[in-house]
A protein has these predicted regions:
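N-terminal secretory signal peptides that target proteins for export/translocation
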Residues: 1-20
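Bacterial N-terminal signal peptides
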Residues: 28-38
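Short aromatic-enriched loop/helix-cap "lid" or pocket-rim segments at secondary-structure transitions
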Residues: 180, 271-277, 334-339
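Serine-dependent carboxylesterase/thioesterase catalytic core
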Residues: 214-312
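Flexible, membrane-associating and regulatory peripheral segments of lipid-active enzymes
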Residues: 40-179
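C-terminal catalytic-base region of ester-bond hydrolases, centering on the histidine
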Residues: 46-84, 318-406
Length: 406
């Protein structure tokens, strides 16, 4: 009964700290100030209902064309010939373009950011593997929810997951601000109560990408001596740190125990908000602000888009590691009030989650799970049970792939 009460509390705890989210409030406040300098907060808000990524949607979008494009909406079903032809032209024009920020910036400029976000989701799920995994994720979420409702806690964990150690890589200032969710406390506690082997990697909370990647590499080497099956889970800033550790610092032979890497809202190719922080003359202003808030400025240059894209281009992840990116893909009506300024600033660059461009979260060769309806901070009351669903799904996927190789 004690286990049941504790687990119930963990699953149902309101996600005000954004369970999977990973950025300290002080840093966010600074980046919000940057965004507000030039952000235009005004854009259309057209009510719409429909479905995205197997999920019911009720929100607002920024253009009639986006409303027409949303699957399951009345506008989508009854769209005019002109709208259908225009959408078909865009799909044909961009259908063979890479899923990168350049493509989605062009789509946004020609249509609207919400249209581009819907196109991003559709393109991701047009991949057979992504479509299959997304469907599996939806089913697993419903299975876990049903078992929780019935209080069958032990059954929420798939047997395949129990054979893995789960190594969580925390986000920015996870020690100074435990309310941010950057330390995965809710997920770790719930999973531990359900009998899973979990560990938090102790990284430098405001260290550089390179410094923390070295720490992660050392931890993986050490844990690999005792565990042959490890799933690594990172969030936000820890995403590029993990990629660097697994894809450059460690030799492929040193990563054989790492079976999967789950990147949650990963700043894989940085954030344009960091670009503004490190650019003169703003850089000296923010050095003073950061010093006052006791935040290390030195970690930010590594989060710029130029540094991050160059770094990622030099990384080669071992093929045996299953990479899964869990991407929040909000429409404009899904953005929380305290995120709207950053989102609005980034809109001119294309679909974004309020901290980074959606395309910049993608890891080459990775499997994508879309979470529509939420911004970068995943303020979803069900985020903790969804974390179980993602972990279960990844373990099952690993088992299926292993069986096919035999």
């Amino acid at each position: 009964m004690a286990l049941r009460r504790c687990a119930d509390e963990r699953v149902r705890r309101p996600a005000t700290s954004a369970g999977w989210a990973s950025v300290r409030a002080h840093l966010i406040a600074v980046l919000t100030f940057i965004a507000q300098l030039q952000a235009c907060l005004s854009y259309p808000a057209i009510p719409v209902t429909g479905r995205l990524a197997n999920t019911p949607i009720s929100t607002t979008v920024d253009s009639v064309l986006a409303k027409d494009y949303l699957p399951g909406s009345s506008s989508h079903i009854a769209k005019s010939g002109n709208a259908a032809e225009r959408i078909a032209r865009f799909e044909a024009r961009f259908g063979d373009r890479p899923l990168d920020w350049v493509t989605f910036k062009k789509i946004s400029e020609a249509t609207s950011p919400d249209f581009a976000t819907i196109y991003f989701i559709k393109r991701c799920l047009s991949d057979h593997t992504n479509e299959r995994v997304q469907a599996g994720y939806s089913r697993e979420v419903e299975r876990v929810k049903s078992l929780i409702h019935q209080r069958h806690w032990a059954q929420t964990i798939q047997s395949s997951l129990r054979g893995y150690k789960i190594l969580f890589i925390p986000g920015f200032h996870y020690l100074s601000d435990p309310t941010s969710g950057a330390d995965f406390l809710n997920q770790r506690t719930l999973m531990r109560q359900l009998g899973l082997n979990v560990q938090l990697a102790v990284t430098e909370e405001d260290g550089t990408i390179e410094e923390n990647a070295e720490i992660i590499a050392r931890i993986v080497r050490s844990e690999s001596r005792y565990h042959s099956k490890i799933i690594v889970v990172s969030t936000s800033k820890a995403g590029p740190e993990t990629a660097l550790a697994l894809g450059r610092l460690l030799r492929p032979s040193e990563t054989t125990s790492v079976r999967a890497w789950i990147s949650v809202g990963g700043l894989i190719r940085g954030t344009l908000l960091a670009d503004r922080v490190v650019t003169w003359p703003k850089s000296w202003i923010f050095r003073v602000i950061f010093s006052h808030e006791k935040i290390e400025f030195r970690s930010l240059p590594g989060l710029t888009t130029s540094a991050s894209r160059a770094r990622m281009n030099s990384i080669r992840l071992p093929q045996h590691i299953l990479v899964v990116q869990y991407v929040a893909a909000p429409l404009s009506g899904d953005i929380a009030g305290d995120v709207r300024a950053r989102y609005s600033y980034l809109r001119k660059y294309g679909p974004n989650d309020g901290l980074t461009l959606l395309a910049d979260e993608l890891v080459p060769g990775g499997v994508t799970i879309i979470e529509p309806g939420f911004d970068h901070f995943y303020r979803d009351p069900e985020i903790n049970l969804k974390s179980l669903a993602v972990a279960n799904l990844v373990a099952d996927e690993l088992d299926d792939r292993s069986a096919l190789q035999k």
